[in-house]
């Protein structure tokens, strides 16, 4: 049986001008001289074709994230960390995207989930003049890139909703360069700004909301955070749904008398995947001839992590969480099981195994891959500050050994010379998770005084700036765009 196949489409011109045409080249040279093609070179270096017909949003974001040199923090293939559209699964299952495509809000969620700063504007929240000014700003810089969501019919093209990055701007012609990620269909092309704006100023039938554009840049902060919401775990959506939808209903349905009862409602029957939902960001390195030293960069990161931990543990909410956890020790529950994983050697054994996998590109399936776990302390300065090294050995498939160190946030020595551990614990995790929940989560608490008390404990406005960043920049976005 014969099947229908297509080889590309003829680019409707006008209104578009093929980038590779003589006129397209002329526009490029002129725009280059105007200084509004600065972002083009980074984008074109990582320009790719979407791997599935409905992956335009994923491929567009993958191009931009790689152009911004954002580290995905996980492997693509072999030992290499690299963004590919098949890896962008933290806000929508890939199988669903493959069939239905992806919406504007979910692409913004994906960008934030993968470490980018996002300024998203639907067409009803902006003007064509604002859009033009932001595009000019992006195209004059290597550090910011614009993604547009538009309906193809507005450009006389076949198809419906589409995402693409913008690669440049020409002032006299008022045209932008669309780097179309469906390269099997249309080549990169220049289009008038006003025409593209009209194509963006349309309704997405899937959501009933306007399309628009977003400006993507790299977060201006070193990767020294303690926690992240592990939205890549298979059960992350059920946990996010429980926290954002079920918890508010549970709080509204019960007569609660104190904060301990509130915490019981939130954590008494969470999905089992909660254990994997919030993750400690550990730092792992190869062992260097048994030499326990820290670079200034390593010291700086560990100091920040220790400061964040200290801010968490001095927060009023932390004291309530600790008290509640103490009351749960005699019970067998998901949260109680979490506490079993709090011991530093057990934590670090898992981490050193994962780290060795990344460092060597060789992982064992099942079994214990780290042995000879050894906890050591190293003085950093004269203020009794020390860091903790947990050293482990990883045996590869060829029976060769690789030593790895897990660097634990700085700790202090107590009055009797004992080190006070500063590694993240269950109480820290739950405190940060509660702070990341939307404020309206608690609005259903019936008792007014209790509701006010809980709200004051979880409000992030009065938190120290380091802890605010930990919650607002790295935790809230995933829950916000669920």
UniProtKB/Swiss-Prot annotation:
SUPFAM superfamilies given in the database record: Cysteine proteinases
PROSITE patterns attached to this UniProt entry: PCS (PS51443)
Family classification: Belongs to the phytochelatin synthase family.
EC number per UniProt: 2.3.2.15
Keyword annotations of the record: Acyltransferase, Cadmium, Metal-binding, Transferase
Encoding gene, per UniProt annotation: PCS2
Known tissue expression: Expressed in roots, nodules and leaves.
Activity modulation notes: Requires cadmium for activity.
Catalytic residue positions: 56, 162, 180
Catalytic activity: [Glu(-Cys)](n)-Gly + glutathione + H(+) = [Glu(-Cys)](n+1)-Gly + glycine
Domain Peptidase C83 positions: 1-221
Alphabetized GO MF terms: glutathione gamma-glutamylcysteinyltransferase activity; metal ion binding
Function: Involved in the synthesis of phytochelatins (PC) and homophytochelatins (hPC), the heavy-metal-binding peptides of plants.
Gene Ontology biological process terms in this record: cellular detoxification of cadmium ion; detoxification of copper ion; phytochelatin biosynthetic process
Protein's name according to its UniProt entry: Glutathione gamma-glutamylcysteinyltransferase 2
Induction info: By cadmium.
């Amino acid at each position: 049986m014969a099947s229908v196949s297509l080889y590309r489409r003829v680019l409707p011109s006008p209104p578009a001008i093929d980038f590779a045409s003589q006129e397209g080249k002329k526009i490029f040279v002129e725009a280059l001289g105007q200084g509004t093609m600065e972002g083009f070179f980074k984008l074109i270096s990582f320009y790719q074709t979407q791997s599935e017909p409905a992956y335009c949003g994923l491929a567009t974001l993958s191009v931009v994230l790689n152009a911004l040199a954002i580290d995905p923090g996980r492997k693509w293939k072999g030992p290499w960390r690299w963004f590919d559209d098949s890896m962008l699964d933290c806000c929508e299952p890939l199988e669903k995207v493959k069939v239905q495509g992806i919406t504007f809000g979910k692409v913004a969620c994906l960008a934030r989930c993968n470490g980018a700063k996002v300024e998203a504007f639907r067409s009803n929240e902006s003007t064509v003049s604002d859009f033009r000014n932001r595009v000019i700003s992006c195209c004059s810089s290597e550090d910011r890139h614009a993604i547009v969501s538009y309906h193809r019919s507005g450009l006389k093209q076949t198809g419906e909703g589409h995402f693409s990055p913008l690669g440049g701007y020409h002032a006299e012609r008022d045209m932008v360069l669309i780097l179309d990620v469906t390269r099997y269909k249309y080549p990169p092309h220049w289009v008038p700004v006003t025409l593209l704006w009209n194509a963006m100023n349309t309704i997405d039938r899937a959501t009933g909301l306007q399309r628009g554009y977003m400006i993507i840049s790299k977060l201006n902060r070193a990767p020294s955070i303690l926690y992240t919401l592990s939205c890549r775990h298979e059960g992350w959506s059920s946990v996010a749904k429980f926290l954002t939808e079920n918890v508010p209903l549970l709080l509204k349905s019960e007569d609660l008398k104190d904060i301990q009862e509130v915490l019981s409602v939130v954590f008494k029957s969470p999905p089992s995947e909660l254990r994997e939902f919030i993750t400690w960001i550990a730092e792992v390195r190869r062992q260097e001839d048994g030499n326990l030293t820290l670079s200034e960069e390593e010291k700086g990161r560990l100091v920040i992590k220790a400061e964040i931990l200290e801010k968490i543990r001095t927060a009023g909410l932390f004291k309530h969480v600790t008290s509640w956890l103490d009351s749960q020790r005699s019970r067998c529950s998901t949260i109680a099981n979490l506490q079993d994983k709090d011991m530093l050697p057990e934590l670090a054994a898992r981490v050193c195994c994962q780290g060795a996998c990344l460092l060597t590109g060789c992982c064992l399936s099942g079994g214990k891959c780290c042995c000879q776990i050894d906890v050591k302390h190293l003085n950093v300065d004269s203020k009794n500050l020390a860091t903790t090294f947990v050293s482990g050995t990883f045996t590869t498939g060829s029976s060769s050994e690789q030593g790895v160190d897990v660097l634990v946030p700085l700790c202090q020595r107590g009055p009797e010379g004992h080190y006070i551990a500063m590694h993240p614990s269950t109480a820290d995790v739950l405190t940060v998770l509660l702070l990341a929940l939307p404020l309206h989560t608690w609005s259903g608490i019936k008792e007014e005084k209790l509701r006010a008390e809980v709200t004051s404990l979880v409000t992030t406005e009065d938190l120290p700036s380091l802890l605010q960043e930990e919650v607002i920049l790295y935790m809230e976005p995933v829950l916000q765009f669920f």
